[in-house]
Amino acid sequence: MLALISPAKTLDYETALPTDEFTQPRLLEHSAQLIDVCRKLSASEIASLMSVSEKIATLNADRFRDWKPEFDFSNARQAIYAFKGDVYTGLDAYHLKDKDIDFAQQHLRMLSGLYGLLRPLDLMMPYRLEMGTKLKNTRGHNLYEFWDDIITNRINEDLAAIKSELLVNLASDEYYKSVNEKKIKAEIVKPVFLDQKNGKYKVISFYAKKARGLMARFIIENQLNKAEDIKAFNTEGYYFDADNSSAKELVFKRDEQ
């Protein structure tokens, strides 16, 4: 199976890295085109476009200016260690074993507004460019139009490389929209995580994001390859709810503590 997760806004370029192994992103010629567009924006235009403060906008204007596709450890780090958010708290990549990272490199992918599709050990320079950003570019009015079928085609190539016909969608809706489902040459399964609050089960963003990371870790550590195997997930109190699940959507619930 191949699992998809979203990136994170928060980045960590300080924590000591557990490995010096790395690969280079595979869609850099496309990333460079986006950088060219972003470099033409002023800090105030970035602030407006991304709905961020002037401070964050200035930081990212500097990042766009400094970006260059010769990545090494002086200016970049592996994606799985660079992202720091709720999903990555659940994934806890720093405590994965070497064999787990090897498996993840083949079976886990991170969607990205700038890099398209990242493998865990792909080096990346710091950036902020969310997939939902309405950035006018040479291919359209937003990043979905820019990436078009490029991400989808790469996913299909990665599925073929591991001889798999199962894609596990652990990404947010914003990022998963960059994938053309109709052209994916695999069965697609989406785990959904519901937490009980005041007697009702619902998606609670913080918990759901962390649970996606926990599920990614579960897949990696157990080297899963069948949709049926996912149903055994029981980390941090979650359990599979067969009655509310379907072939395409696997529901996991957690009772209120």
UniProtKB/Swiss-Prot annotation:
NCBIfam families assigned: PRK02101.1-1, PRK02101.1-3
HAMAP family in the cross-refs: UPF0246
Annotated GO biological process: response to hydroperoxide
One Gene Ontology cellular component: cytosol
Organismal lineage: Bacteria, Pseudomonadati, Pseudomonadota, Gammaproteobacteria, Moraxellales
Record protein name field: UPF0246 protein ACICU_02469
Pfam families: H2O2_YaaD
Top-rank lineage group of the source organism: Bacteria
InterPro entries named among the record's database cross-references: YaaA (IPR005583)
Protein family according to the UniProt entry: Belongs to the UPF0246 family.
